[in-house]
């Protein structure tokens, strides 16, 4: 008999119902649960799939470059970055009538095109690309890397090239290579690119392979490096009148500490960024020599962890046993990696707009809004994934004997205290924040706005003042001219920084008031509640008072288990599922706040945010309703416009989102009856009944229906807000 899907589980392959298909898809990547899997094959499969992932990433980025080179207007945009709209790619659609063709023919194109709101034009321009030829060669190079990655993935599955388990578990070597090789060498290489290509490019010099060796990046070459006069590399920086991409007002410095922004591009100084990457490179190259491998020198991570025991004796055995626990658990490692990546992605969102690195990106408002929102959503999904794998670690990989009285065991011992404190914090934040908002709503409704409770965020204002913001009058640290901090940096980076922080046209340390205070606490509520659900899911994953043997049931289990009705509500999967809703909720508030504050900043009517953000009706009316008017008006009796596609996507997003509720509210019996009715009708319909299936149709389990509902809810939620964000911003600022 031919092997049926799924081949990796013969038990599932023999299931006579449609469960075979859905469970097969659900467990396709759960290598640990596959038939005849060994630890060695598990590691090798994951290793090979990493190369496949890299191949896809390189192919995708290659496609970005290729389509812009082929159908974009990069060369025209380079001539006038502030007024030419960057084109992502052409649109070919046989349904377009004349009005649609006219509406979407923009940016100097000959036919309908998509405008790029990803910031790639600004990025490529900043790093020294100037022509379509440059873009094509970049695309080809990435395509080559993609092919190499595929080849490497295939190669490492061949018997001769399969790494052994001991190779995968050699933590010191891996850390050394990742610190020195991945971060150190690549940062050094990037510094080299900035110094040799990007900085000359910003000064009007076109450096490529043909003249790379003949153009000195600095007039004195490597002299200052070898004679120890490194400060010469910082002398004669670009002047404040420098025109980016030309020699007008350009200097010769390559590694500086100017602080603040380039006045014309409103982005960080390229020479500051080169200096930053050089410092990072040196730091990581050193860090990559810290751990003991072949030569018997350096730290052993196991020894470090075994020595980490709190000296008082009242805090248990600290990090004892952690080395083997982490090194033998892929889920623990993945959880740590995802948690780190999630934090860094959110930091990217915060820093891309407040400290823009790419020339002219700060003046491209729609791109700024899109990139902030994009990175915050990605961060949210990655963070929830970190806790999911943390919970799987506790179920599959945690060994109580190996971790007696160490930090992991003590987390489990104290889980009631941890969960109840998170619960208390969430309740406190929720009731107080909502109470303030609702009080203010009532005061406005009764025509007495002066009776609102408005709280100034004085501690946050004090922190901003300490960083040099003078408008609050705190006169502390960098905002005080006679503080030691001020005097120490006065001759180097401070003038540029202070100029930037006190200039109201950028997003560095925005002025904050009572509206910010309230929304800050609303976001804190969302973060604490999301954390509560995720932490409880992980800490209760092995067992709870209600279900002490939970670990034997795995990460997700059905509600109609053996005499255990309703138990799927307490599986670790269910905690993840609930947390994603709260995560989306929280990021909704974060992005609403960011977007509304910036729209009013860019339009020059900051008072609208300040006055309307202190009560809920203000958010609903003056942010959501007011800014969705163009979307609701995307199709009207006068034909269509360039926002019509977003109006359609806004509706479509709502549809997908609402479909989610159908799966979330109805349970298994509903689907079973529906499916049996459909199957009955199918079998009695002429022609249709010629098509037969071998598997007996069974309904989604509750766990599956929740997954389908969650997927629709998330996708619809994000589509709806993406359309709203891009249309409301591009509709205002072009």
From Swiss-Prot:
**Residues involved in chlorophyll a B1 binding:** 654
Q: Which Gene3D superfamilies match?
A: Photosystem I PsaA/PsaB
**Subcellular location, record wording:** Plastid, Chloroplast thylakoid membrane
Gene Ontology BP term (one): photosynthesis
Q: How does it sit in the membrane?
A: Multi-pass membrane protein
Which PROSITE patterns does the record associate with it?
A: PHOTOSYSTEM_I_PSAAB
Q: How is the cofactor bound?
A: P700 is a chlorophyll a/chlorophyll a' dimer, A0 is one or more chlorophyll a, A1 is one or both phylloquinones and FX is a shared 4Fe-4S iron-sulfur center.
**Signal peptide feature range:** none
Keywords from UniProt, A to Z, are: 4Fe-4S, Chlorophyll, Chloroplast, Chromophore, Electron transport, Iron, Iron-sulfur, Magnesium, Membrane, Metal-binding, Oxidoreductase, Photosynthesis, Photosystem I, Plastid, Thylakoid, Transmembrane, Transmembrane helix, Transport
Residues at which chlorophyll a B3 binds: 662, 670
Gene Ontology cellular-component annotations: chloroplast thylakoid membrane; photosystem I
Residue positions annotated to bind phylloquinone are 671
| EC number(s) given by UniProt | 1.97.1.12
Q: How does it assemble?
A: The PsaA/B heterodimer binds the P700 chlorophyll special pair and subsequent electron acceptors. PSI consists of a core antenna complex that captures photons, and an electron transfer chain that converts photonic excitation into a charge separation. The eukaryotic PSI reaction center is composed of at least 11 subunits.
Q: Which family does it belong to?
A: Belongs to the PsaA/PsaB family.
Q: What is this protein called?
A: Photosystem I P700 chlorophyll a apoprotein A2
- Species name for this entry? Lotus japonicus (Lotus corniculatus var. japonicus)
């Amino acid at each position: 008999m031919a092997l049926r899907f799924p081949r990796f589980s013969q038990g599932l392959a023999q299931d006579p119902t449609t469960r075979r298909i859905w469970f097969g898809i659900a467990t396709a990547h759960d290598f640990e649960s596959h038939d005849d899997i060994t630890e060695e094959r598990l590691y090798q499969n994951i290793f090979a799939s990493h190369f496949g992932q890299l191949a896809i990433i390189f192919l995708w980025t290659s496609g970005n470059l290729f389509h812009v080179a082929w159908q974009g207007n990069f060369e025209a945009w380079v001539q006038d970055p502030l007024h030419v709209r960057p084109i992502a790619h052409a649109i070919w659609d046989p349904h377009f009538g004349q009005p649609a063709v006219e509406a979407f023919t923009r940016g100097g194109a000959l036919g309908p095109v998509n405008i790029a709101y990803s910031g790639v034009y600004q990025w490529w321009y900043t790093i020294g690309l100037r022509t379509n030829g440059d873009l094509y060669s970049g695309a080809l190079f990435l395509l080559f890397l993609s092919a190499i990655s595929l080849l490497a993935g295939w190669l490492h599955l061949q018997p001769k090239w399969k790494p052994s388990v001991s190779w995968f578990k050699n933590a010191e070597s891996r850390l050394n290579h990742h610190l020195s090789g991945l971060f150190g060498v690549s940062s050094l290489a990037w510094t080299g690119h900035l110094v040799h290509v990007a900085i000359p490019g910003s000064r009007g010099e076109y450096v490529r392979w043909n003249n790379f060796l003949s153009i000195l990046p600095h007039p004195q070459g490597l002299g200052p490096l070898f004679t120890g006069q490194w400060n010469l590399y910082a002398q004669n920086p670009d002047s404040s009148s420098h025109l980016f991409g030309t020699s007008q007002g350009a200097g010769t410095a390559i590694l500086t500490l100017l602080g603040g922004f380039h006045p014309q591009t409103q982005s960080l100084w390229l020479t500051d960024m080169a200096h930053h990457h050089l410092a990072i490179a040196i730091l990581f190259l050193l860090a990559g020599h810290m751990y003991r491998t072949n030569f018997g020198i350096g730290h052993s991570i196991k020894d470090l962890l075994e020595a980490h025991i709190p000296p008082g004796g009242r805090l248990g055995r600290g990090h004892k046993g952690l080395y083997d626990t982490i090194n033998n658990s892929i889920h623990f490692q993945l959880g740590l990696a995802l948690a780190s990546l999630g934090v860094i992605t959110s930091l990217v969102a915060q820093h891309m707009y407040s400290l823009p690195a790419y020339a002219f990106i700060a003046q491209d408002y729609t791109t700024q809004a899109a990139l902030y929102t994009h990175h915050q959503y990605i961060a949210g999904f990655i963070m929830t994934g970190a806790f999911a794998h943390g919970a799987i670690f506790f179920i599959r990989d945690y060994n109580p004997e190996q971790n007696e009285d160490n930090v992991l065991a003590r987390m489990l011992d104290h889980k009631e205290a941890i969960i109840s404190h998170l619960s208390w914090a969430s309740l406190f934040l929720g009731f107080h924040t909502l109470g303030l908002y609702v009080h203010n709503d009532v005061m406005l409704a009764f025509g007495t706005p002066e009776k609102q409770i408005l709280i100034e965020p004085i501690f946050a204002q004090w922190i901003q003042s300490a960083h040099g913001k003078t408008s609050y009058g705190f006169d502390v640290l960098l905002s005080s001219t006679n503080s030691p901090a001020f005097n120490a940096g006065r001759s180097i980076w401070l003038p540029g920084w202070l100029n930037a922080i006190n200039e109201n046209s950028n997003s560095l340390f925005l002025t904050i008031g009572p509206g910010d205070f309230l929304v800050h606490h609303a976001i804190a509520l969302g973060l604490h509640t999301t954390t509560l659900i995720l932490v409880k899911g992980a800490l209760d994953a092995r067992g709870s008072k209600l279900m002490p043997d939970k670990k034997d049931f795995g990460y997700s289990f059905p509600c109609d288990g053996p005499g255990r009705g309703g138990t799927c509500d307490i599986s670790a999967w269910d905690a993840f599922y609930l947390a994603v809703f709260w995560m989306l909720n929280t990021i909704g508030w974060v992005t609403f706040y960011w977007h509304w504050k910036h729209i009013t900043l860019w339009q020059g009517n900051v008072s609208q945010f300040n006055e309307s953000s202190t009560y809920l009706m203000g958010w609903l009316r003056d942010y959501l309703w007011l800014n969705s008017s163009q979307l609701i008006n995307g199709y009207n009796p006068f034909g269509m416009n360039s926002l019509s596609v977003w109006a359609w996507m806004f509706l479509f997003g709502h549809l997908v989102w609402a479909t989610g509720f159908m799966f979330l509210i109805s349970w298994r019996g509903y689907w079973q009856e529906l499916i049996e009715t459909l199957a009955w009708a199918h079998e009695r319909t002429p022609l249709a009944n010629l098509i037969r299936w071998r598997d007996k149709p069974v309904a989604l389990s509750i766990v599956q229906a929740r997954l389908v509902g969650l997927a629709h809810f998330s996708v619809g939620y994000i589509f709806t807000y993406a359309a709203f964000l891009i249309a409301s911003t591009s509709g205002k600022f072009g």
